Amino acid sequence: MSRVPSPPPPAEMTSGPVAESWCYTQIKVVKFSYMWTINNFSFCREEMGEVIKSSTFSSGANDKLKWCLRVNPKGLDEESKDYLSLYLLLVSCPKSEVRAKFKFSILNAKGEETKAMESQRAYRFVQGKDWGFKKFIRRDFLLDEANGLLPDDKLTLFCEVSVVQDSVNISGQNTMNMVKVPDCRLADELGGLWEHSRFTDCSLCVAGQEFQAHKAILAARSPVFSAMFEHEMEESKKNRVEINDVEAEVFKEMMFFIYTGKAPNLDKMADDLLAAADKYALERLKVMCEDALCTSLSVENAAEILILADLHSADQLKTQAVDFINYHASDVMETSGWKSMVASHPHLVAEAYRSLASAQCPFLGPPRKRLKQS
């Protein structure tokens, strides 16, 4: 659910004249999504104009607005008989009306959104009213196995809804002597110390390259570096650390994160950076890598990512990988990565099977939630 942000200081709202008084209006919008899977879709016997409805859903437990999706598998009328028709229906509403935008898509065999269609404006809904698309997708295209829209004869529809709520006005008065507090540049300034090797007091040797750093910053950010410098270890005595199992480019990205909290090249090296983050106990960087790897999950790499997650105790990534494998089990088990995992990591194969067996109902789709970052 979106929140009303604090209004920007008047001086930041415009570079032109500053008025004596001002008002900031925020239109509140609640956004939520819903996924509906229809099993054995090709066996639908509904005739033209007949309807299948989903269960009701809302944005949360306390939301009194109830919605559902409505599908006409063989079209709504003669004009749309060769299409699947799809609508969003307002089932119950305590108000006289609400306005909402919506977007429909189909999840393909890889869990990717395809064939998306969305409303061009916020439509007016009253209880019992629906809006949608009479010609959402041609039936022959949908049923063609080559298009991959019905894996295991399952049609998975994904709906995103944006409900317009009340607007909020925040107003105030300007004073003649406005003070603008500068933005905090701590991350940039610490990053400059790293990039320009200023006032350094230790050396880090990585793959034959020497990097200059600051013991205090390394110790504050990483418990592993802290232990090196705090105790009477060789690194503490010589102010020199040998790092043998991290590539130079990965190490530089890790150090940039240590100094700035940012990792601009993370997507290019998420697997190697995950290993480095695990070794040096950089928990936030580790979860950032898990999140990036979750977005790259595919049938081809799911087994490799599961092995990586298990090796580095990346629990959130491991859960997502197991769920993905369960959803795409028949395809994943044909890959070389899975066959290799069967031989090298049989305990992970057993975990995946236990997870699938313990499910109370068929898994409806790949997880879409963000990972929790510490």
Curated annotation (Swiss-Prot):
Main localization (coarse): nucleus
GO biological process: proteasome-mediated ubiquitin-dependent protein catabolic process; protein ubiquitination; regulation of proteolysis
Segments forming domain MATH: 31-161
Start and end residues of each stretch annotated as Homodimerization: 297-355
InterPro entries for the chain: BACK_BPM_SPOP, BTB/POZ_dom, MATH/TRAF_dom, SKP1/BTB/POZ_sf, SPOP_C, TRAF-like
BTB domain boundaries: 173-297
Pathway annotation: Protein modification; protein ubiquitination
Cited Pfam families: BACK_BPM_SPOP, BTB, MATH_2
Top-rank lineage group of the source organism: Eukaryota
SUPFAM superfamilies assigned to the protein according to its UniProt record, in alphabetical order: POZ domain, TRAF domain-like
Region (Required for nuclear localization): 71-191
One Gene Ontology cellular component: nucleus
MF terms (GO), sorted A to Z: ubiquitin protein ligase binding
Location(s) in or outside the cell: Nucleus; Nucleus speckle
Function of the molecule: Component of a cullin-RING-based BCR (BTB-CUL3-RBX1) E3 ubiquitin-protein ligase complex that mediates the ubiquitination of target proteins, leading most often to their proteasomal degradation.
Family note: Belongs to the Tdpoz family.
PANTHER family referenced in this protein's UniProt entry, alphabetically: SPECKLE-TYPE POZ PROTEIN
Domain notes: The BTB (POZ) domain mediates dimerization and interaction with CUL3.
Protein name: Speckle-type POZ protein
Organism, as annotated: Danio rerio (Zebrafish)
